[in-house]
Amino acid sequence: MFDLPKTSEIRKPLHKKLIYEKYAAELSGNKKDKFDADISRMIITNEISEASVNIKATEEISAIFVLQVELKRKEYDDKNIIMISKLFGQKLLIVLHYENAYQLAIYETRLLKADWKNEGEISLRLNGLDLGSVWDNFVTQVSGINVQTGNTLVEQINVEAEKEKLQKQIADLELKARKEVQSKKKFEMVQRIQQYKELSLIHI
């Protein structure tokens, strides 16, 4: 699947019961029902390790698992996917599947997601001299983030998160400014919008 090496294929079911046991506190009340409403079943499809693909491990990363999650609905709750991503204590690339569409998701300081695509449109490349760099490349492939010179991957992810936050604040303020009838308040909002835009340029 997605051009990953055949030698990495394992296809091992991951039962929801394991998640219910590990996250009993987090899935209390109706949260378990919400999880069940999102997730149909899960299968570990690939294990990318030194043994399976002949790319050396690092101290931090001994393997990267690919987990296919069959969804019951397309508009799932991110919190459920974040819980799944932390289950192993290992690096996990998640393939979300709904009807004929796939979405890649990966957790690196926060949940990062690609656009929904058809299977034939997705190609995962094992780029890197070790599993650490393969993981970093998976993160950039999924998120579309370009790491700027002088930044680490994590630093760039934080920069992108700050940019997204500023862009949302700008959009919210622009909407309020359009509705505002008092000229003084409208002017103050326009000034704040300009400040946010200048800040967003600093982060580019």
Can you annotate each of these PLM segments?
Residues V159, K163-E180, Y196:
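Non-transmembrane amphipathic alpha-helical segments
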Residues V147-A161:
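Short, charge/polar-rich alpha-helical segments
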Residues M1-F88:
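N-terminal, leucine/charged-rich tether regions that mediate assembly and partner docking
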Residues K72-N151:
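Extended assembly-interface/linker segments at domain junctions
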Residues I202-I204:
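Conserved small/polar residues in nucleotide/adenosyl-binding loops
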Residues S183-Q194:
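Short, charged, amphipathic alpha-helical segments
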